[in-house]
Each structure stands twice: as structure tokens, then as C-alpha cells.
Amino acid sequence: SNRPMPLNIKQFNNMIQCTVPARSWWDFADYGCYCGSGSGSPVDDLDRCCQVHDNCYNAGGGVTGCAPKSKTYTYECSQGTLTCSGENSACAATVCDCDRLAAICFAGAPYNDNNYNIDLKSRCQ
């Protein structure tokens, strides 16, 4: 689809590019059971990173009225290190941290090409 991405998703993609420069964010958009969807059991560590990220978003950090998918925030990327700005609102700070921790998690998890674009119906019940 050519719909523009929500700004926050774009920011998350930029964070991933910061910690995993060798891969496209697209590699993470449809991986395992949780990177791009969300059901069943995670297939590996990278998929687990996405499950944790989903749970982080769903919790909204406990901030009332916080909508993580559309919330933008301020952060910096310096030589692969992500820092969320102290100027962020409570909601933005929470979402920034969800994304920051996931991007760091992605960098530390092995990428298994066999888990890209898997059959969700058979593998993610």
C-alpha cells in the first residue's frame, strides 16, 4: 500500500536503522509471529523482541490516553546509540523507550531468513 506510514512508525524505523544499519526496516516488518502481526508463540529471539514491543505499546506505559502508534517523540542516534530526549511528555517518553528498547533488542538478536514472511495461519496459532 502507498499510504503514508504513521509518523511514529517512521521514527521506529529510523531507530532500527540506527542500531541495525546493515538491514532495511522492511526486514522486520513481516517477521515471525509478532513483527508485523501478533498472535501465537514467538518463533525466536527476534520475534520475542517484537512481542515485548507489542506489549509495551499495548500497555501505553500506563499513561492514560496515550496512543503509541501515533505518538511522536524526540530522540537522538549517535554511532548506534539511541537516547530519548528528556523534553518528551510522559506519553512520548514511554513510547520512545518502547521503540528504543526494541531497536536495541533487534540489534542483539540473530536474523533467521526462514522466519521472514512465514505462514501465520499454520505457525502462529
UniProtKB/Swiss-Prot annotation:
GO cellular component term of the entry, any: extracellular region
Residues forming coiled coils: none
Cofactor: Ca(2+)
CDD domains in the record: PLA2c
Active site (catalytic residues): 53, 99
GO biological process: arachidonate secretion; lipid catabolic process; phospholipid metabolic process
Broad EC category: hydrolase
UniProt signal peptide: 1
Expression tissues: Expressed by the venom gland.
Enzyme Commission code(s) on record: 3.1.1.4
Swiss-Prot/TrEMBL keywords: Calcium, Disulfide bond, Hydrolase, Lipid degradation, Lipid metabolism, Metal-binding, Secreted, Signal, Zinc
Domain of life (superkingdom): Eukaryota
Physiological role: PLA2 catalyzes the calcium-dependent hydrolysis of the 2-acyl groups in 3-sn-phosphoglycerides.
Full protein name: Acidic phospholipase A2 6
Species in which this protein is naturally found: Naja sagittifera (Andaman cobra)
Organism classification: Eukaryota, Metazoa, Chordata, Craniata, Vertebrata
